Amino acid sequence: MRSNLAPYAVSDTNSRGRRIHEELPAGRSQFQRDRDRVIHSTAFRRLEYKTQVFVNHEGDLFRTRLTHSLEVAQIGRSIARNLNLNEELVEAITLSHDLGHTPFGHAGQDALNDCMKTYGGFEHNLQSLRVVDVLEERYATFNGLNLCFETREGILKRVPKSKAAALDELGTRFLHGHSASLEAQLANLADEIAYNNHDVDDGLRSGLITLAQLEEIEIFARHLHQVKQHYPDITGRRLIHETVRGMINTLVVDLTVQSGTRIRDASPDSPDSVREKPVLIGFSDTIKRQQQELKRFLHKNLYKHYQVMRMSNKARHTIEKLFTTFETEPALLPYEYQQKFQEYGHQAIADYIAGMTDRYAIREYQRLFAITEN
């Protein structure tokens, strides 16, 4: 761990610790240990075959939840270093924030949430926490990964008060309107930077959106013009890459400068004092407006594109069919999950489906419903 952390940064010495006590790791900080445990987890490896926007088999070059998580971690660490925050904590949060995502991206989550409405619903942040607290089975003396409080808290972006009470100390900030650590705030916005800009990149690669369309979007048009001015002969993938690269750099610089100013003005002197302040990590008003314009464009032209909607519809059908089949006949679950169904009820079905990769979900559907000669 760096020795020049700001007093308001989370550190080993002011961490609230782990649910189950462990001796301090040799040669690593507490949050390096958290990061390492996440990277070595089964759930993390599965992210390689979980959708970001495009279903995994649609192309080899589109982003997955794994590549997205790595990109978020890189952005988060860069900003954390400039703000003298705890880079290892930011990395641990960003690498674990999507562990609970279903197959097929948001279409899969929406479908599973609908299936679970009667049983408390489904939300991927809470499922990510469940993965690191309960579902990973790697260690001799505890379930889950036994991560530090601050890493676990950082996984949770939004939790309704109706569910926050069941989270004990983790739910306190949602019940009382307190802020999260600066590292958690940063991880949230690093996710937003990566998500929007890399969806632009993937959308252009897929051909579902075009440069001509994006030239109507202020932040993209400005950076496209700058790239063309600097490199008059640039075309194709290089032009797109340099434009997206410039957009990400602008957002990183803006977030760093604006957040640094807000932190100085608020003068927090400890991680606990941060919780009593309003959210301090944020963009300028201009960048927020431009980001919202880009989000609206992506929602209308990429996420609602008929080809993406077709993929989403197939994903929803697959998730719903798997859930209702297992609900009606739990004996069709793998034996391990039949046992868990006895203990957790429908949550066990949600755990099983949420843990699937895109490919596994498709194959499980085929195993259950496809009639073949074999």
UniProtKB/Swiss-Prot annotation:
Which Gene3D superfamilies does the entry mention?
A: Hypothetical protein af1432
> Matching InterPro entries, A to Z?
dGTPase (IPR006261), dGTPase-like (IPR050135), dNTPase_2 (IPR023023), HD/PDEase_dom (IPR003607), HD_domain (IPR006674), PHydrolase_assoc_dom (IPR026875)
Keywords in alphabetical order: Hydrolase
Q: What's a BP term from Gene Ontology annotated to this protein? A: dGTP catabolic process
Please state every residue range assigned to the domain named HD: 65-196
PROSITE patterns with a match to the protein in the record: HD
**Which SMART domains does UniProt cross-reference here?**
HDc
* Database matches in CDD domains: HDc
User: What is this protein's record name?
Assistant: Deoxyguanosinetriphosphate triphosphohydrolase-like protein
Q: Which organism is it from?
A: Nitrosomonas europaea (strain ATCC 19718 / CIP 103999 / KCTC 2705 / NBRC 14298)
